[in-house]
Amino acid sequence: MIEVENLYFDYTDFKGEKIELLKDISFKIESKERVVLLGVNGSGKSTLLKILNALVFPKRGSYIYKGMRIRKRGFKKISRSFRKDISFLMQDPNMLLFNATVREEIEFGLREFGFDDIEKRVEETAKRFGLEKYLETPPFYLSGGEKQRVALASLVAIEPEVLLMDEPSANLDPPTTEWLMDLLRELDITTVISTHNLALAQKFGDRALVLSDNHTLLFDGLLKEFLKNEELMGEAKLLHRYG
Ligand SMILES: Nc1ncnc2c1ncn2[C@@H]1O[C@H](COP(=O)(O)OP(=O)(O)OP(=O)(O)O)[C@@H](O)[C@H]1O
Ligand SMILES: [Mg+2]
């Protein structure tokens, strides 16, 4: 479903120097796989997710989604079906909330993609996400965890095939994190989730992609194998000295 091959991404910093952020990254993700993306701060996780969501494009190498090469040139032609298929819960939910009320927030995507019975879908989604009492509230007033839930509700309402999530548990308390995991299990769609929470990672998915701090792909395989391998964990700088 998702094929990334020899992908490179760089940017030019304020001194005019080229900084490589993703180097020679290759992996494949099959439909309905649940993949956990690990790596230290700045290793490139969010950037990789942005590439998978076609918010930025690779500098070299390829990203192929359902057999289509995703690149800047010609993206407009497929952007509508691509955006219906792939949803991205960004690291900061504020980036995703721009409507006057929670109701309008959930309605937005449903309208955009021409769903029928929008009212009914909004009610159902609100119920599923425990947002009924906030439907007329401006998202602006909500707590971080509640905003996260609204952002996720708006994305899931349009029934995407792929859900990309950047640190989804960062704002969530333990019961809401548990609820998120149940939801992901129930959704049963392709998911790629970046997280720093190794204790929870295994509940999010079985497979891990691990970026090293030199921006290459250090590991692609079973998450439980990675967590057992102290040498690799050390190389990824994901071991705690105070444990
Ligand atoms: N266009 C750009 N201009 C300047 N700096 C950039 C640009 N794009 C990315 N960066 C830098 O690249 C680095 C990698 O960013 P990214 O957000 O992908 O890392 P991350 O693995 O998600 O980190 P975190 O765990 O902190 O969320 C960061 O240091 C960021 O500041
Ligand atoms: Mg990030």
Where are the regions a protein language model picked out?
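Conserved beta-strand-loop-alpha-helix hinge in the C-terminal portion
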Residues: 215-239
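Conserved ABC ATPase signature
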Residues: 138-142, 146
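Conserved ABC ATPase "signature" region
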Residues: 117-134
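Helix-to-loop junction immediately C-terminal to a conserved catalytic motif
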Residues: 53
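Catalytic Walker B motif of ABC-type/P-loop ATPase nucleotide-binding domains
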Residues: 163-166
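Conserved ABC transporter NBD signature motif
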Residues: 61-72, 82
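H-loop/switch region of ABC-family ATPase nucleotide-binding domains
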Residues: 195-196
